[in-house]
Design a protein with these regions (language model features):
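Solvent-exposed, well-ordered loop and adjacent helix/strand elements within mature globular domains
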Residues: 22-207
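Acidic, low-complexity intrinsically disordered segments
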Residues: 2-14
């Protein structure tokens, strides 16, 4: 599950929402309507790796346990990050499980590969969107020709396989893959490999 972190508030959402509404209204007013084309904002989510959450890098790495972890202890900030991103990669597997996933409330569970409602997440291909949208719905493949998206992800083709309660209309949350976090605090929602926050793009649904 893609869970939009509060610390992504540095994205200027009022301005972004206004731009999305304006551009999509223009598309809707064409004689052919949207016709499988939307104007979207691409954001990023990822699977944080426990190995990056150290005191040396400025994280709260105090080892704690939570319901569902059977007494196994993990860095406090790592569990905070898993709570926001949905899954986390463990440094050492537990009973063959390389990941933990957030289970809601204050609870976690050991799991296999990160997945959404549409199966295992594939780095730089899987994406999440707000549920209930008629065009940008689960199972749809889209092309986002933005040069920024191509530069960050090395890809412009996505399949919507996931949802998230904090996602906005016309937002495509692109799955980056596994990485250590960029840094503590607000940078915990960013993978170490990029400082990307958001980019606008047209999105065409593949027929």
């Amino acid at each position: 599950m893609s869970i939009l972190p509060e610390i992504r508030a540095d994205i200027p959402w009022p301005e972004v929402v206004q731009r999305l509404a304006y551009e999509n209204e223009k598309l809707a007013q064409r004689p052919q309507g949207h016709n499988g084309e939307y104007f979207v904002v691409c954001t990023l989510y990822y699977t944080p790796m426990e190995s990056g959450f150290t005191f040396e890098r400025g994280f709260d790495a105090t080892p704690i346990t939570r319901p569902g972890l059977h007494g196994h202890k993990y860095p406090r900030d790592f569990l905070r990050s898993v709570k926001k991103e949905g899954f986390g990669r463990l440094r050492e597997p537990v009973n063959g499980h390389d990941y933990i996933r957030y289970n809601g409330g204050d609870s976690f569970a050991f799991g296999s590969k990160p997945s959404g409602g549409g199966g295992t997440l594939v780095a730089r291909f899987s994406a999440a969107a707000k549920p209930g949208q008629s065009g940008l719905r689960r199972g749809v493949a889209i092309e986002t020709p933005s040069s920024t998206v191509r530069e960050v992800f090395g890809s412009t083709r996505w399949k919507i396989v996931d949802t998230g309660g904090g996602l906005r209309r016309w937002q495509i949350d692109c799955y980056y893959g596994e990485d250590e976090p960029l840094g503590p605090g607000r940078f915990m929602a960013r993978p170490r490999g990029t400082t990307f926050e958001y980019a606008y793009s047209n999105a065409r649904i593949e027929k």
